[in-house]
């Protein structure tokens, strides 16, 4: 009995320092690889001390995906508005600047021809067409009144002027302009535009001159209806003379209108659909 007690005393197991065999053989969870292991304590005081000393930290295996910044959406471009007529009737009857340019060219030729005819014959444009003149305006021919009204409204843009004219790209300068490609005409050798106008006349300038011609022919007809005199006679120009005796200023104006009508201006006509 005494020997048994001695063996038991000598074989005392230190449970605080070493884990038991059962604890070693237990399968350990995956979290024990990442979390710090806590020593096993049996006393309540030791357990409270160790829990307050060691705190468990959570380790994330996969980081959350960073959100991409929102894409900046560019504000929509404002659509350029086409020029309206003077009464806000832009294109109301399908009249565009290209149509107005054609009407202006016809008016330039007609106005120049009427001035030249009056200078040579001494008769105004209506007298040359054997129409009655020297009467009140309300007694004039209805077709003639419509022609006058059409020219006046077209000259001030009241018929509508959809679209616009844009200039051609700038020509080459410096060395590129000095080099003359083979097979070009005499205009290129002088540094002038090959296919465009001779003096840089644009379609916008041509449109303006056409409007002036429309105003001129309309007012000359109105004056001739009322007074019975042509446009030159109203301005006290000498008429009924040979062409070589016509005033130089008058000849210059006639030649200018003829030249502006037949010489194509630079630039091109675009509409809203072509801009889009």
Curated annotation (Swiss-Prot):
SUPFAM superfamilies in the cross-refs: Chlorophyll a-b binding protein (SSF103511)
Record keyword Transit peptide present: yes
One Gene Ontology cellular component annotation held by this UniProt entry: chloroplast thylakoid membrane
Pfam families, per database record: Chloroa_b-bind
Single biological process term from Gene Ontology: photosynthesis
Transmembrane segments: 106-126, 140-160, 207-227, 242-262
Membrane topology: Multi-pass membrane protein
Residues of the transit peptide: 1-67
Localization per record: Plastid, Chloroplast thylakoid membrane
InterPro entries, A to Z: Chloroa_b-bind
Keyword vocabulary terms for this entry: Chloroplast, Membrane, Photosynthesis, Photosystem II, Plastid, Repeat, Thylakoid, Transit peptide, Transmembrane, Transmembrane helix
Main location: plastid
Positions of Sequence repeats: 62-168, 169-276
Keyword Transmembrane helix (UniProt): yes
Family statement drawn from the similarity comment of this UniProt entry: Belongs to the ELIP/psbS family.
Biological role stated in the UniProt entry: Seems to be involved in non-photochemical quenching, a process maintains the balance between dissipation and utilization of light energy to minimize generation of oxidizing molecules, thereby protecting the plant against photo-oxidative damage.
Protein name: Photosystem II 22 kDa protein, chloroplastic
The organism of origin for this protein: Solanum sogarandinum
